[in-house]
Amino acid sequence: MAPTLRRTSPLPRTLLVGLLGLSAARAAAQCPDGAPPPCRGASAATRMHPVNPQLSQHTWIVVPFTNATRTADLDWLRDASVNLLTLDLGQWSDIRVVDDKHVGDLLRELPPARVAQPLTLNDGVAIARRAGAGRLVMGDYFRIGKGARFIVNVFDVVTGKRLRSVTHDSADPDSVLGAFAPIARGVLALPPPPDAKLGATGTTRVDAYQEYLMGTTALNRFAVDTAVVHLRRALALDSGFALAHYKLAVAMHWTVDRSSADAESAHALAASRLSGGLPARERALINARLAIASGENERACEGARTLVARDSLDVEAIYTVGECEYHGGRQIGEPIDSLHGRFRGNWNRAIASFRRVLALDPTYHPAFGHVVDMLSPPVVVVCPANPTPGVSCGNDPAVWIAVIIREGDSLDIRPVRSTGPDYGAQFRRATANRSRVLNLQAARRIAEDWVEASQHGARSLLDLGRLNIQLGELAAADDALRQIGKDADRQTRVEGLEWRLQIAAQRADGPGGLKLLDSLGRLMVTTTDSEMYASHAIVYGKLQPIHDVIRRLGAASRWPPERVQYTLDVPRILLGVPDERFLQDERAFWLVAPGDSVCAAGLPTCRTSFLLPSLAYASNVRRTWWPPFSVETWGYRFEIARGLSMNDRAAVVKSMEWMDSSSHADNRVLAEESSLTALALGGALAIGDSSRALRYARFATDTLLPYLYDSGVGGTPGGAVYYKPAMAPRLMLLRAELEAALGSRDEARIWYDRVLSLWSDADAELQPVVARIRAARAALGPPRD
């Protein structure tokens, strides 16, 4: 997330005219009360026009003060003056003060050349009129010894006349922050209310406040890691700084570290506890953030909407409404009945709120993030609060699931039970109208607008690249991800490199992938980082990192040696080149695994479920032993193995045909097909049907690999390891071997070369496999002219 320049041109027309194609006018696909359309009282959203609101003498606005002596170490006060004085003026409940965020939005409406210059009275009056403020506060400050002198003027916006002037001296740098309390009293020419705590910026330390300002600026441009660094520094300097706790909670909300959720809650709670001296608006925003962090999104929305009702231009409050509606859209409230649920939030309202934020401030980049999040997934899944013992979320009959269906320019999202008839109907409806494709395309348009608005900010490039991968446009994805510079935040650089590693795997670019892997290795900090690095290293024949991770996880979880050894076999099984001893390790693990021996494979209580990797992805290996399959399996990934164990060729063929059909259907709507074709391919090889196997291999490599590919195998328990990348070399190698066996030598050469490219620097453990591939490639002879 590289630092970006503030955008001064209007937001791209595509975003303002048809943001996502999802406007508040079409929020009826999910009514405010969660019921299906039509909704009572629904009204069309009106397009914004730059019409000045009516001036009110009870509305005040503070614009940046002028550094009259141009003292470099006081430059920070130019923008800080707005925040500091606004906070102190905001203690009075009988006046309204335009928040500093909105002041920044209005400043961007000035000609670019004027923004960096000292503001004239005409500039100030124009800004005040745009905000409907009848009272304008402008000021100058001068270096006086070690401190500063402030001369602050109050103007009547209607007449342009100065109403009063206030002068205040601060003796030293540490007293600068405290200067704004007496300035506020002088500006208002009124005694403070009895319960007001003036000077309530939340800190008395200038250095802490400066770190807070830098952190807030970074957060607004979505440089999350940078924001976290500065905000933590602010709290290290002053642990009681409520506003720094609040902004750090917001920043932690966007991080991916496992402990970030706990940190978000802790900082939101600290901000709430320390916020007693802050103005009512800031206290309300903090309490809304605490509610979001606590999962109380309806309460958060209630508080944020109160702020919006008071000030319809309060960007931060509007953004908070979008946040709580978005997260509430992943929570189930009181269900309509046993088969039909109701979300606590509404994604159409969330999109409308984020749309409003971006119309007011195109540089408020976090508003882009959740819009993309809402349009990217095919479904919303809500696991039960009280899960069925021993049953995973996806298999739990109490799970709620909602297919994200696009209807015109809105989303229709209704949670139903996965076991009920409505889920299938939703999926068919979404397939028929290509909801997934249209939503991804809409999300990409938003990401493109975000890239423009942020002037190629790193986070926007990351999301654009990810969406292009999901749409199968690898060249465009790589182009976007390559633009993420070394000055971007570490988190964004790591994610960008991971996506580029996937592209390199899909393109069979071994040398390029190894360079990216080396770059990723230099950015590793956390345990999660090392696990993800190991997951990607598998593709390039690097097994030692994944073996180290498995041994560490096994030791931490006290796995029996048999489980550790079997898990060490899994990477090669997924690559399609299993070690010859894996069958022995498989049986040894099954004998000591916990759970029932006669049961439905796929259930967590069944010991055979532990053998999913080898039973599903090494089904073509000749066996002398099978675990018991006398009970029907729970989950399709075991069905081919069950059919083979029972010598039931018809059952195997039936499973393969279902998988092949489902894979094609998923691909048509760009849904992750969970390695259905890879499973079917293994079954075809197991029954000796080479022509069918080649057909599956060609579909997998030509049609599926250009898209985001899902292996359908979860990660190692207790860690972030996942095996999705291993599918690329596996499918390429199978394609090469099948083409060679059926006489397509030229095609076989192509696919052997791709595998050899990926494994150009494979570990010693894989070198015998690499030698065998080279020999098979050489046996094909030279290419035909």
What are the residue ranges of the model-derived segments?
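TPR alpha-solenoid repeat register
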Residues: A244, A317, A367, A425-Q426, ...
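Residue at a conserved register position within TPR or TPR-like alpha-solenoid repeats
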Residues: A218, M252, A291, E325, ...
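A structural "domain/chain start" motif
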Residues: A29-I95, V103, T204
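Short coil/linker segments at helix-helix boundaries
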Residues: A208-Q441, R445, S711-K724
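Catalytic-center loop of serine/cysteine hydrolases
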Residues: G34, C39-H49, N83-D88, K101-A223, ...
